[in-house]
C-alpha cells in the first residue's frame, strides 16, 4: 500500500475509524468474498489483487475468520497458483465448502494446458489449510474464457452442485467425493425471464449481453423452516449483473437447474469505486450477512478491490431486501476476549501495516512505521483485572514502541511496550509489560470498580506504533493479555510480605514471612511514603493445598528481643522444628542473630537467651539466617550479605559449636573466618558468566538437603536479584554455583528464596513487588511473596522457571471442604481486604502489638463494594443447602455467593445487618441452590455500609 498516500489521509482515517468497518480488511487488496460458517466461526475466502495493478493479475487466495463479525484474523494464503501445476495466471474468484470433515476449495485459474480459464479444486483437513490440489489437474476446462467464478452448494438430499461462468452460467453435478462429477456439462437458459432484460443505458456499444447476468454466481437454498418460501422460489442464484459497472441481482427457481425467474436487484449500482462486484451470503449466530467488494481502500479501485460486509434481514418469504453499501459495516455480535494468546494479525481496523507469513511463525504483522496502528473492537475486560501484557516481536533495526490505548489512537494509555532491536526481522523475542494501574483511573462510564480501580467493562483497544520516523520499526507476531486469575499472583493480599520461610509439619505447610509495613502502619508520619524498609514483626501463613492460605497474623516482633538496638529491621527469618519445639532465627540488624522458641508453630515465641546467638560486631553482615538439621542430627546455620557464613548449632538449637566459617567464593571452600584471607568475594552481574565457584551470591541463603545433595539457594547479585543456587556433596562445601532457578528481571528488584518438598511436589518461594504494582509503580519496599513448583533433573540440578507472573497459577493439591468451619482469612485471593487479630486494632503494629500474640483468632475488615474472597477448588459434592457467615458490624453488607468468577452463577445471598458492635459476632445465613461438584467460590461484597468484620463461614 502506498505509504505516502496513507500518511496524507491519516487524519481522516483516524477521525472515521471509530465508525468505519468497511472494507474490513485493510492490509491487502482483497476481492470476491466467499463466506463459510464452520464450528462457530465465520470464514471468508478471498482473492488478492496485487498492489498498483493494471489488470486482475492475481497470484493467490486468502482466508480470514471472525467470531464477532468485526475483529478478523488473517490466516494468510494457504492456496496459490503454485499449488496447481497446471495453472499459470489469474487466481480469480473461488468458494470453499465442507463435507465429511474435509474442506473443498473450488477455484478458477488460467490453464497451461488449454490456454483458457479452468475450474480446479483443492482439499484440506482444516478450513485454514494447508490446501493441496485434490486431483492434480483441472476439474473442468475446454479452452474457453467462460470458466470463472465457481460457486458450490450441497442440497438437502446430499447432491452437490457446482456452478460458474461469464457470460454463460454453467453447472455440474458433483459426486459425493466432491472432486469428480457425473453427467454432462449443463447450461442455464440465459433468458430475459430468467435473468432480466439488459440495461440499455449501460450498453453504449449495442447488445453485447443477451441479459443482465454477467458473472460471479452464488447458489443457495432458502431455509423453509424459517421463511414462508414459495417452493417454486426455493433456490436463489445471486450474481453480478449488467456488465460494467456491475450491480448485484438474483433469480429464483424450484431446482438448481431451473427454470429460473428474475427476482430483482439486491445491491444497486453505487459509488463503490469498483466497476466489478462479487457477492456471497451467509447466516451466522442468528444474523444474515451480505459480502461484496469495493475499491475504497486508499490507492484502490477496479483492480485494487476490498471486501466488505452488510447485515440484512430477509423478507418474510425469504426474498432479499435492497442492500446498500456502507462505510459503517456491521455491529459486533459478541465481545472480544483479550485474555488469551491473540495473533497480531487479528484486527477490526488498521492503518499502514501489512501481513506476511513464513514457516516458523505463520502470519505476522509487518511494514510497521511510526503512527501506524491496529484497532480491536468491543474488547471485554469484564470482571477480570488485566495484569500482564506480552508481545512477540522482531526488529532488524532499533525497534520502537507499542502504545496500548483505549477507544482511540489518542485515548487513555494503558501501557507502553518497548520493543528492542532483536538482531533481525525474523529473530523473535517475547517482551512482557506489567500494567500500571495508576493509568486506569477516571475512565468514563460504563465502568466497574474493583478495589478502587475503575476499568471499562468493554472498550476498543488500539495498538499505536511509535518510533523513529521513516524506517520500518519491527514485526509483530502475537500478543497476550493475562488477568490476575490467569497468572501466578502473590500468595497474600491483606499484607505486604517478604523473605518466605517454608516449614512442613505433617500435612500442613507453614510459611513464615517478614512484613513490610503499609503506610498506615508506619508510626512516623514523615516516613509513611518513604521508599525504605519498615519492618517490625513476622507473620505466619499455612496451607494444605498450596492455593488456599490461612493467615495467622504476627507470631513474633522485634519486641521479643529487648536487647535489640533498633525499632525497625525485622528482616528475613527461618523457623525449624526439633523435638517438638519450634526455633525461630531472626536477624537484629546491626546486633547479630537471635533465636526465639515456642511449643507450637503458631507461637507464642520467647527469647531463651536474652542476647544474640551470633554477633560479629565488626560488621553488619549478620542477616538472613537459614537453619538445616542434617540426617545425622547435626544442625547448621548459614547466613550473610555479601559473604556466606555458617556455624554448627548444638542439639539444643540455641547455642553454637566451633568457629564461624566463611565460604571463599573463588574456590567454594569454607575456611574459619578468623583465618587471614578467608574472605574472598567478587560479585558480578548475572549477565556475566561466573568464573569463580560462587560468584553471583548476594544474600538470602537457603540451606537444605535433598537426595544426598546439599543445596544453597540464594539471591543473586543486586540489583535486580535472581534466584540462584549452588550444590555440594557436603554441608560445608566446597560449593559450586549451578545457575538460575529464576533469572533476574527489571520487573523485580530484590529476591529471597525458600525451598521445600510438600506432598510429593517441590516448591520455590520468593518475593517481588507485584502486589504493590496493582496500586503504584513508584518504588517502595512493599513486597509480596509468590511460589511456584520446581522440577529437579536426574543429576539433582534444578530446572529454570520463568518469572512469577509469566506462569499459570499453581496446581491445587486437593479440594477444599466447605462443610467445615473455614476462617474468613482463608483465601486464594482477597485484594483490598485487610486482616487483624481479634482484640488488636490495626492502628499501628509497633504501638499495639503485644510482645507475643500466639494463635489468636483473626478477622477480615475494611470490606468495600466490589471486593471479594476467592477460594479455589471448593468441593460441594452432591450439593450444599445452606451457608452461614459470622460477622460483627455497625453497618450492613450483602454477601453474594458465586461460582467460578465474580459474575458467575449465584448460588446464594446473605445480608449482614448491624450487630451493634464490631466486637459482637453473629451468624447470618443464606439458602443455597445449584452448588454441586467442584468450583471456585467467590464470596462477593456489595451494598456495604459502616464497619463490617468477618470471622468464619461454613456450608451445610
Indicate residue ranges for each PLM-predicted region.
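Carbohydrate-active catalytic/glycan-binding domains of CAZyme proteins
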Residues: 20-909, 913-956
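Bacterial Sec-dependent N-terminal signal peptides
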Residues: 1-21
Amino acid at each position: 500500500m502506498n505509504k505516502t498516500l496513507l500518511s496524507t489521509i491519516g487524519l481522516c482515517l483516524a477521525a472515521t475509524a471509530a465508525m468505519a468497518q468497511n472494507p474490513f480488511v485493510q492490509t491487502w487488496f482483497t476481492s470476491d468474498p466467499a463466506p463459510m460458517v464452520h464450528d462457530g466461526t465465520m470464514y471468508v475466502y478471498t482473492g488478492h489483487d496485487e498492489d498498483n495493478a493494471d489488470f486482475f493479475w492475481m497470484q493467490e487466495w486468502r482466508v480470514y475468520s471472525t467470531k464477532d463479525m468485526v475483529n478478523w484474523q488473517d490466516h494468510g494464503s494457504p492456496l496459490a497458483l503454485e499449488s496447481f501445476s497446471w495453472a499459470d495466471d489469474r487466481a480469480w474468484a473461488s468458494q470453499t465448502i465442507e463435507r465429511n470433515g474435509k474442506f473443498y476449495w473450488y477455484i478458477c485459474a488460467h490453464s497451461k494446458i488449454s490456454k483458457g480459464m479452468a475450474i480446479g479444486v483443492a482439499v484440506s483437513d482444516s478450513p485454514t489449510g494447508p490446501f493441496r490440489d485434490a486431483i492434480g489437474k483441472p476439474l473442468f476446462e475446454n479452452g474457453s474464457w467462460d470458466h470463472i467464478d465457481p460457486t458450490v452448494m450441497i442440497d438437502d438430499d446430499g447432491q452437490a452442485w457446482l456452478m460458474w461462468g461469464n457470460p454463460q452460467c454453467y453447472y455440474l453435478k458433483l459426486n459425493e467425493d466432491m472432486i469428480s462429477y457425473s453427467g454432462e456439462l449443463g447450461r442455464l437458459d440465459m433468458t430475459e425471464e430468467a435473468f432480466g432484460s439488459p440495461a440499455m443505458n449501460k450498453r453504449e456499444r449495442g447488445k453485447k449481453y443477451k441479459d443482465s447476468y454477467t458473472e460471479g454466481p452464488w447458489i443457495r437454498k432458502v431455509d423453509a423452516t424459517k421463511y414462508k418460501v414459495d417452493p417454486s422460489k426455493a433456490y436463489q442464484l445471486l450474481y453480478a449483473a449488467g456488465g460494467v459497472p456491475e450491480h448485484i441481482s438474483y433469480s429464483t427457481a424450484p431446482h438448481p437447474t431451473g427454470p429460473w425467474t428474475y427476482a430483482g436487484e439486491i445491491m444497486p449500482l453505487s459509488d463503490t469505486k469498483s466497476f466489478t462486484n462479487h457477492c456471497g451470503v451467509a447466516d451466522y449466530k442468528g444474523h444474515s450477512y451480505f459480502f461484496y467488494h469495493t475499491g475504497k481502500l486508499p490507492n484502490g479501485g477496479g483492480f485494487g478491490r476490498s471486501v466488505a460486509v452488510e447485515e440484512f434481514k430477509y423478507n418474510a418469504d425469504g426474498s432479499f431486501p435492497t442492500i446498500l453499501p456502507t462505510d459503517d459495516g456491521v455491529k459486533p455480535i459478541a465481545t472480544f476476549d483479550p485474555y488469551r494468546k491473540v495473533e497480531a494479525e487479528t484486527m477490526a481496523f488498521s492503518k499502514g501495516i501489512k501481513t506476511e507469513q513464513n514457516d516458523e511463525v505463520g502470519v505476522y504483522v509487518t511494514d510497521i512505521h511510526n503512527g501506524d496502528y491496529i484497532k480491536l473492537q468491543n474488547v471485554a475486560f469484564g470482571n477480570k483485572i488485566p495484569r500482564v501484557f506480552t508481545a512477540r516481536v522482531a526488529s532488524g533495526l532499533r525497534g520502537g514502541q507499542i502504545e496500548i490505548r483505549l477507544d482511540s489512537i489518542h485515548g487513555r494509555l494503558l501501557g507502553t511496550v518497548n520493543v528492542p532491536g532483536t538482531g533481525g526481522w525474523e529473530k523473535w523475542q517475547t517482551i512482557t509489560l506489567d500494567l500500571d494501574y495508576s493509568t486506569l483511573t477516571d475512565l468514563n462510564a460504563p465502568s466497574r470498580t474493583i478495589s478502587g480501580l475503575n476499568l471499562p467493562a468493554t472498550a476498543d483497544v488500539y495498538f499505536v506504533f511509535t518510533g523513529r520516523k521513516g524506517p520500518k520499526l519491527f514485526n509483530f507476531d502475537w500478543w497476550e493479555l493475562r488477568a490476575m486469575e490467569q497468572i501466578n499472583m502473590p500468595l497474600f493480599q491483606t499484607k505486604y510480605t517478604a523473605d518466605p520461610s517454608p516449614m512442613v509439619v505433617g500435612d500442613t505447610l507453614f510459611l513464615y514471612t517478614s512484613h513490610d509495613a503499609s503506610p498506615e502502619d508506619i508510626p512516623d508520619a514523615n516516613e509513611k511514603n518513604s521508599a525504605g524498609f519498615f519492618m517490625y514483626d513476622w507473620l505466619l501463613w499455612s496451607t494444605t493445598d498450596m492455593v488456599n492460605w490461612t493467615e495467622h497474623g504476627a507470631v513474633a516482633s522485634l519486641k521479643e528481643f529487648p536487647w535489640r538496638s533498633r525499632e525497625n529491621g525485622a528482616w528475613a527469618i527461618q523457623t525449624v522444628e526439633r523435638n517438638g519445639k519450634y526455633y525461630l532465627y531472626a536477624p537484629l540488624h546491626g546486633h547479630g542473630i537471635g533465636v526465639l522458641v515456642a511449643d507450637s508453630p503458631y507461637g507464642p515465641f520467647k527469647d531463651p537467651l536474652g542476647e544474640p546467638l551470633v554477633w560479629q560486631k565488626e560488621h553488619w553482615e549478620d542477616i538472613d539466617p537459614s537453619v538445616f538439621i542434617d540426617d545425622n542430627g547435626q544442625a547448621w546455620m548459614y547466613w550473610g550479605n555479601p559473604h556466606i557464613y555458617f556455624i554448627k548449632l548444638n542439639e539444643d538449637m540455641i547455642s553454637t559449636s566451633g568457629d564461624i566459617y566463611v565460604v571463599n567464593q573463588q574456590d567454594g571452600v569454607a575456611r574459619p573466618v578468623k583465618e587471614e584471607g578467608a574472605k574472598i568475594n567478587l560479585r558480578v552481574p548475572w549477565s556475566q558468566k561466573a568464573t569463580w565457584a560462587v560468584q553471583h551470591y548476594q544474600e538470602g541463603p537457603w540451606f537444605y538437603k535433598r537426595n544426598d545433595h546439599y543445596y544453597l539457594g540464594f539471591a543473586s547479585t543486586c540489583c535486580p536479584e535472581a534466584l540462584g543456587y549452588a550444590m555440594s556433596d557436603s554441608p560445608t562445601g566446597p560449593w559450586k554455583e549451578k545457575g538460575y532457578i529464576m533469572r533476574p528481571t527489571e520487573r523485580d528488584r530484590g529476591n529471597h528464596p525458600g525451598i521445600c518438598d510438600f506432598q510429593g511436589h517441590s516448591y520455590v518461594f520468593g518475593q517481588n513487588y507485584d502486589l504493590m504494582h496493582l496500586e503504584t509503580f513508584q518504588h517502595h519496599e512493599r513486597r509480596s511473596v509468590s511460589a511456584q513448583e520446581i522440577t529437579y533433573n536426574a543429576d539433582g540440578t534444578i530446572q529454570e522457571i520463568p518469572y512469577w507472573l509469566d506462569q499459570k497459577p499453581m496446581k491445587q493439591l486437593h479440594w477444599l471442604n466447605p462443610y467445615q468451619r473455614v476462617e474468613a482469612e482463608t483465601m486464594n485471593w482477597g485484594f483490598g481486604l485487610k486482616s487483624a487479630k481479634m482484640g488488636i486494632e490495626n492502628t499501628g503494629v509497633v504501638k499495639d502489638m503485644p510482645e507475643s500474640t500466639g494463635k489468636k483468632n483473626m478477622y477480615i475488615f475494611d470490606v468495600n463494594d466490589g471486593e471479594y474472597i476467592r477460594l479455589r477448588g471448593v468441593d460441594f459434592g452432591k450439593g450444599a443447602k445452606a451457608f452461614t457467615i459470622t460477622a460483627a458490624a455497625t453497618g450492613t453488607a450483602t454477601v453474594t455467593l458465586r461460582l467460578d468468577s465474580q459474575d458467575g452463577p449465584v448460588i446464594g445471598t446473605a445480608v449482614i445487618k448491624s450487630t451493634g458492635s464490631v466486637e459482637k459476632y453473629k451468624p447470618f445465613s443464606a439458602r443455597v441452590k445449584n452448588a454441586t461438584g467442584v468450583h471456585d467460590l467467590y464470596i462477593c461484597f456489595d451494598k456495604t455500609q459502616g464497619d463490617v468484620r468477618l470471622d468464619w463461614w461454613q456450608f451445610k
